[in-house]
Structures are given as structure tokens and as C-alpha cells.
Amino acid sequence: MPKPLNNTENNLNTNRIKDLIKKYSPPFWVYDADIIYKKINLLRKFDVIRFAQKSCSNINILRLMKNKNVKIDAVSLGEIERALLSGFKPSTNEIIFTADILDEETLLKVAKYKIPVNAGSLDMLKQLGKISPGHHVWLRINPRFGYGHSKKTNTGGENSKHGIWHPEQAIPIIKKYKLKLIGLHMHIGSGVNYLHLKKVSQAMIKYAFQLNQKISSISVGGGLPIPYKFNDQPIDIKKYFMLWDIARKKISKFLGEKIELEIEPGRFLVAESGILISKVWATKKMGNKNFVLVDVGFNDLMRPTMYGSYHHISVIYGDDRKMNEKETIDTVVAGPLCESGDIFTQKEGGTVQTRKLPTIKVGDYLIFHDTGAYGAAMSSNYNTRPLIPEILLKNNDSIVIRRRQTIEEILNLEK
């Protein structure tokens, strides 16, 4: 859950943030490596931890993962290149490519480096088999149901593009091209609960029995939730592992094979390690609503606009005023973009909400919590706004792991 800025449990506290504000001009992202390490250690019972790098794809974060023996999931050619640059080895199981299509350039890359492919469509198997017989593959199965904190994060069922609906149809293709099936994969969406978790683990058992193929691994996918709100409960990792371990043992006994249990977290490993630091540049009254405008928009943090996602917001005064947190004002927090939807306090569907925040003035700072996942990774240049820096806190030091982009760099692509 969001940690108050007066906490002493990690580096994301008021004193450290004030030092960073002096050293690096806002806006910028901050990650605490120690928090990432702690989250990795919570998952050590799984045989393989495979980081969903789409959640936070900075190569310096990937190197942290590599140093802790975390493997990598890539979902694009660019993510394959990031993984290779970060030190992950091809022709092993350190990198797996997961997708529903294989364009020509990506196909040639995975074939050249023998990167295992987690296939979400039958066409992928055919295309891969034609140029790379014997290639190691997984089947991403759509279990015909899904779950998500938003409709847009539901990755199962007939409204989802992800996965293979009839996995039994994949077996003749695999045999025709002499592909090597090594694993089965399921991922039904983000923010899964225990009821759906049990359902998907039972589905994995069902499909493993029906297909009856000699595999070496099953992947539970990702979707592990984190508590974005103070009243959210953290997931019980022991219970999560136990449910999947039962499934693994049943499949292992049926197939007569040792089965490795993989997990593919993204948000769980990095979300709570990150904050977004912004500066207030305007306040205004619009009818009965109080607006505070900061120098980051949905081009930086997309989740509130795209999903109606909640991020806790803290305030640090830019002067020596004393804060009375008991005296709050219902406040709408918005960004600088030329878009009505550039509001951080909204529900899914765009309904504007308010947050109870202290009195805020121009020159104060707003801190968005738990932005380490799907924050910087989803940033864009919309409104021709440059990407902002990323700062990593590690070994009592702060390191710029992505410098501030310039407008000239954006325009150079078009010359």
C-alpha cells in the first residue's frame, strides 16, 4: 500500500525526495532498487521468476533483474533488443518472446538467436516452423474466461485477442514442423483474485491432461496485484504459490515428468518501487471545483486516463509553510496537455473525481505513488512533450538511468 512520505522503511521519503528535487529539476521518475529486491525475494519459491519487462523496460532495471537471477519476458523486437543489451543470453530460457503475431523482422530475430517463443496464435507456429524447425515453443492458452481490474486489462475470454482458443489444433502443427513444445502458459488479466486464480489453475490442469504432451514447464502468467489504496490488502504469496504448486504436482504426476513452475510478474516487482515527482504551476477555481495543474500529463502517466486507475498523491510544500494534513480541500489534479481527459483524479469512463489534499500553491510538489509499473514504460511524446528523466536509488546513491529527452531529438526523426 502507499507508504507515507514520513516513512523510514525505504528511500522514498520526504527528506530524500527534497534532496532529489534540488539535484534534479522536476518532473522525473524515481525507483528504489531495495524495494525491487524485496519483492523478488517474496517469489523465490517459484522455480523461475520471469519479469514482464513491458511494465518497466529501462535497461538498468533489467540489469537489476539479471543480477538477481530473474529471467525476462519480451513482447516485441525492441524488448528482445533491450534484454540482449542488458546481458540476458539468447539460445537459453533467459529470454522468452510472448506475442500473438510474428512480423518478419521479429521472426528472423527469434529464429537467429533461438529465442523460445510463447505462441498466442496458430499462425505463429506455422510461420516459425517453416524457417526454424526444432524451435522451442510454449502454447499460450486462452482458457475462455478472464479477469482484470479494468476491461482493458482482461486477457482471457472471447473478447480478448490473446492466446489460443483450441490448443489441441496446435499439436499437429508442432509435429509437422518438428517444433519442441516445452511449456504451457496462461494469463487471464491483471489484479487476479483467489477465486479466479483457482479457476485458472484448474484450467491449466485440464488442458495439460487433454493435450497430454511431454512438457517441462507451466507458467502461471502475471497479473499479481499490488495495494494501490490504503485499504487494499496485499496478496498472500504463500496461498498463491500453494494453489499453483498443487496444479504443478498433478500435471507432473500425470505426465511422468518434472515440471518447473514459472511466474511472470511485472507490476508486482516494480510498481511500489517507483514515484513520479511533479511541480505545481497553476491553481484555479472552476465552478465549485478546485483544480491543481502540474507539469506531468497522461503522456507521462497514462494509467489514470486509460484505465481510471488510482495513484495515491502526496504533497511536499515548496517553501517553509507548515502542513496541516487535517485541513484538506477537495481537489482535482490535472496535467498540462491540450486534452480534457488529462486528469489524474478520474474513474474508468472519465468521470472526474476529487482528492482530499492540503492547501496547495504554485511551486509546491505533488508525488504520485506506486508508479514504477506502466509509468515511464507507457510514456509518449504527445503534444511534442519530451520524455522525462528516470532516477534510480541504489547503494545510497542516485543515478540517472534515462536522461531528459530534448525537443530537438524528437524533431530529428522527421528531418
UniProtKB/Swiss-Prot annotation:
Keywords: Amino-acid biosynthesis, Decarboxylase, Lyase, Lysine biosynthesis, Pyridoxal phosphate
CDD domains per UniProt: PLPDE_III_DapDC (cd06828)
UniProt KW Chaperone keyword: no
Molecular function terms from GO: diaminopimelate decarboxylase activity; pyridoxal phosphate binding
Cofactor(s) for this UniProt protein: pyridoxal 5'-phosphate
Residues at the catalytic site: 338 (proton donor)
InterPro entries per record: Ala_racemase/Decarboxylase_C, DAP_deCOOHase_LysA, De-COase2_C, De-COase2_CS, De-COase2_N, Orn/DAP/Arg_de-COase, PLP-binding_barrel
Domain of life of the source: Bacteria
Keyword Amino-acid biosynthesis appears in the UniProt entry: yes
EC class name: lyase
Residues bound to substrate: 267, 303, 307, 339, 374
Catalytic reaction(s) noted: meso-2,6-diaminopimelate + H(+) = L-lysine + CO2
Pathway(s) this gene product operates in, as recorded in its UniProt entry: Amino-acid biosynthesis; L-lysine biosynthesis via DAP pathway; L-lysine from DL-2,6-diaminopimelate: step 1/1
Enzyme Commission number(s): 4.1.1.20
Modified residues (N6-(pyridoxal phosphate)lysine): 54
List of residues binding pyridoxal 5'-phosphate: 223, 264-267, 374
Record GO biological process: lysine biosynthetic process via diaminopimelate
Subunit structure, as described in the record: Homodimer.
HAMAP family linked to this entry: LysA (MF_02120)
Function: Specifically catalyzes the decarboxylation of meso-diaminopimelate (meso-DAP) to L-lysine.
Family: Belongs to the Orn/Lys/Arg decarboxylase class-II family. LysA subfamily.
Record's protein name: Diaminopimelate decarboxylase
Gene: lysA
